[in-house]
Each structure stands twice: as C-alpha cells, then as structure tokens.
C-alpha cells in the first residue's frame, strides 16, 4: 500500500516535509511502514525529506501501544499527533490536510454509537459525509449503520490537499461491499458517486482471499488521487490480483497466504503500466454509473355498478343512500370500462368516489387507462447503464415500449447510482471437460471395477 501512494510520484518528491495520516491506525504499523518507504525512495532520488505521522485510534489498548511506539522512535514528537477516540464522531484532525493517507478501517462493523453522537443518522451534517457536485447536486453519503467503512474513505477524501503540486494520495483497504452495496441514491452509492464523479479514483485492486489474520473474505485496495496524471484523468483501472499469492507454510488465523516481494512488484508493474490485460482493465468513469428508473403503467378499471357497498363505508346511512342513488342515476350506455367517464357521470365528490371505488371496480387490462394514475402492481424498476446509447429515452423506446406501449417513466423517482463489479469484468467460466476426457475416464472406471459385481453377488449366494 505504501508503494501505491509513493512510487507513482517518487520522481516528484522534493526536499520537503510531508505528512502521512491513518484514521484507523491501530498500533501504527501502516504509518511506520509508510515512513520507512518514503525515506527509502527519497534516498534513492537524492532528496532530503522528513515526514510527520498522524493517526487516530478508538481502541484504548491499541492506541496506547501506538502512542508508546511513537514515543520510543526518533525524538518522540510523532506521538503528539496520535489521537484517541472515534475518527467518525470525534475527528482529532478536523482542520488538517495531509499529503498521504492509508488505512485499513473496520468493515462490516456497526457505527450506530457514532451516528447517535453525531445527532442521528438522518440529521448528520458533517461536511465530510455530505458533498456538493460540480452541478450543485447535494449528496448525502451516510451509509447504513451496520457498516461504516466507507465513512473512513470519505474522511480521508475530505482531508486531501488541493493547493500543492502533488495534491494528496490515498490507499485504503475495504471489503467487497464498498464496491456495490447500496441501491441508487443510497448513502453507499452516493459515496461512490462522489468519489468517481470528482475523478478521485485511480484504481481498485482485488487482493487474494485470506490475506488478513481476522477475516478470510476478499479485500480491495482503493487508490485515490486528486492530482491524477494526464493518462488517468477520467478513468479507473481495475486490477485482479486475486490469483497473485504465495501460500504460507502455516496458517496464521484466517491468513493462509501472502504477497511476496516479487508479487508486490508485479502488481505495481501492472498499476504503473496501466495497460489492458487479463488482470487489468481500464474504463472511463461513466462505465460504473447507471440510472435507476421507475417505469409506470396506467391503472385500468372496469366498473360493476350493481355491486354492494358495505354499510360501514360511510358514517351515516343517508350518505350511503345518496351514493347508491347517484350510481343508479348514471345514464344508460355510460361505458363501464372507463372509470374516468363513469365517475364523472355520478357527479359524486372525490372523497366519496375514493371510498366506493374498491367495492365497485376491478382491474381489467382491457379497460381504458386512468390518466395520471399508475397501477402499482405493474410498477417496475429498470437499471440503465450510463453507457447505454441514447440513454433513458432510447432504452424505453427499444426495451420497454415494444412490450408495454402505455408505459412511462416517473421522472421524480429517477436515481443515479454507481457500483464497481469485478465479477462482471474478470469472470472466468469453469472450463467444461471435453467429451473425449469423459469417455476416457468412464472406460478407465469400467476396467477398474471389472469383476467386482460378480464377487459381490458370489458372496451373497454363498
């Protein structure tokens, strides 16, 4: 991870002081590795640099270890920059910006307590988690309280420098839910939308499973920069490194493999070259966006004027009598397959019509449509990629209208979503065995079992 934030800009490193931050620093391991790697690269390029480490940790034991470790190293001043408490609800670095950031935040962990401290999930106004796009669109990026991992990525993004040549670079580990959890318009999807439409995402790297001690699930490294090199602007690179692993001789908890130096170098080579291959794909940002639209179809009702209306439909008996009289007074020949015409003919008020309609009508696909009133049973949701030629209008014309010519899109319900799917781009179907191989195995099995049945039956007869 340190290489991902330092190596791409190693030739731009100057004689200067840099800052590195980890908002979920644990015992400070990542910060220490980052410091060592930056100093190493600076030495290779003949630069004199110093680095200030900043971190925050919520667990008291690991915070104490981190603090003590920083006190013992160097002049001990780094320890002053390690904060205690929750990064989400008690940001110890609210006014600071950093050159480099890296984290391995908790994933799949509730942040309900933090949400309550921040005023409740629906009322969080923290600018780290609420953003405005260039077109003025406000995005609430508050995820479900059961998993707050994306908030750590947003926290880092909010601390990026904008007034320096290098800007800021971020590398952060997440599980798969950060890529696709949440429907269009949800907090998770809005977070991805903000990061992608702001052109902050350089790459996402899929790591092998069982890479960490405490979990066997697949993990992904998000690489962010707000000063992308020209070739990366408007694009995201996906790297499938799931097969790049070296097995451990002995498992360490869930961890049963590692990335050797050679494998890490290979991942960096793929990242730096940014070329298409079986394990590397480069896409325009729009590839990951989509519209979620609500497709409506009109309600169609057939009227059955002779049906009984329950006595308790109205508070007073005379009200029911007036309604029944109004229905009987509808002129003969008034179409019963058109609710709009029939209801107007009764001359009843809207409130009365609303009460009686469930009892004297039934849905009928052959009846006339009621203008502006959708049939909720026929409501459908469609997902349309941004890359669909012609957009929503073309999709409706090509995919919906041929089968439902009366359909329309409820524009007020249209949402924009973003997701990144490695399965979509790197799926490898299981290779089926050839017929020759199967026949060969069957013949081999037949020869191996030849005479077995005779032996078994012979034993039974005796």
What is the predicted function of each stretch?
Residues 1-103, 107-123, 175-177, 183-191, ...:
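Conserved S-adenosyl-L-methionine
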Residues 39-41, 87, 253, 302, ...:
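Alpha-helix termini
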Residues 41-43, 449, 461:
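A short hydrophobic/aromatic micro-motif that marks alpha-helical segments and, especially, helix-coil
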Residues 95, 99-455:
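A conserved structural/catalytic subdomain of Rossmann-like adenosyl-cofactor enzymes
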Residues 455, 459-462:
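Soluble, cytosolic/nucleoplasmic coiled-coil alpha-helices used as oligomeric scaffolds and tethers
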């Amino acid at each position: 991870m340190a290489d991902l934030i330092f190596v791409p800009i190693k030739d731009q490193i100057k004689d200067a002081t840099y800052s590195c931050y980890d908002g979920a620093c644990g015992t400070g391991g990542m910060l220490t590795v980052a410091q060592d790697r930056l100093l190493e690269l600076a030495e290779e390029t003949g630069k004199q640099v110093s680095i200030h480490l900043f971190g925050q940790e919520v667990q008291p034991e690991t915070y104490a270890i981190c603090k003590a470790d920083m006190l013992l190293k160097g002049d001990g001043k780094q320890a002053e920059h390690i904060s205690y408490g929750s990064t989400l609800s008690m940001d110890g670095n609210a006014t600071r910006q950093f050159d480099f950031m890296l984290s391995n935040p908790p994933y799949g962990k509730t942040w309900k307590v933090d949400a309550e401290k921040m005023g409740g999930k629906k009322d969080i106004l923290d600018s780290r988690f609420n953003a405005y796009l260039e077109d003025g669109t406000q995005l609430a990026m508050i995820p479900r309280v059961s998993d707050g991992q994306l908030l750590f990525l947003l926290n880092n993004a909010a601390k990026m420098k904008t007034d320096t040549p290098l800007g800021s670079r971020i590398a952060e580990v997440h599980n798969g839910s950060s890529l696709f959890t949440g429907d269009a318009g949800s907090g998770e999807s809005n977070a991805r939308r903000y990061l992608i439409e702001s052109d902050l995402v350089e790459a996402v790297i899929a790591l092998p499973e069982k890479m960490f001690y405490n979990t066997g699930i697949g993990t992904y490294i998000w690489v962010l920069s707000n000063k992308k090199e020209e070739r990366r602007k408007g694009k995201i690179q996906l790297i499938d490194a799931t097969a790049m692993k070296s097995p451990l001789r002995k498992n360490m908890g869930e961890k049963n493999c590692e990335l050797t130096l050679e494998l890490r170098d290979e991942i960096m080579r793929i990242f730096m070259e940014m070329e298409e291959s079986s394990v590397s794909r480069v896409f325009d940002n729009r590839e990951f966006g989509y519209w979620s639209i609500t497709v409506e179809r009109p309600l169609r009702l057939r009227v059955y004027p002779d049906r009984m209306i329950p006595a308790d439909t109205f508070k007073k008996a005379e009200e029911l009598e007036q309604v029944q009289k109004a229905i009987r007074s509808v002129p003969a020949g008034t179409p019963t397959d058109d609710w709009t015409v029939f209801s107007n003919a009764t001359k009843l008020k809207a409130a009365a019509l609303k009460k009686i309609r469930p009892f004297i009508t039934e849905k009928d696909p052959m009846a006339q449509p009621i203008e502006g009133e959708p049939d909720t049973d026929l409501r459908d949701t469609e997902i349309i990629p941004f890359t669909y030629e012609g957009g929503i209008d073309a999709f409706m014309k090509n995919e919906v209208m041929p089968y439902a010519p009366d359909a329309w899109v409820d524009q007020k319900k249209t949402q924009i979503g973003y997701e990144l799917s490695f399965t979509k781009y790197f799926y490898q179907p299981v290779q089926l065995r050839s017929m020759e191989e199967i026949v060969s195995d069957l013949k081999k099995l037949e020869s191996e079992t030849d005479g077995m049945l005779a032996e078994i039956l012979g034993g039974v007869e005796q």
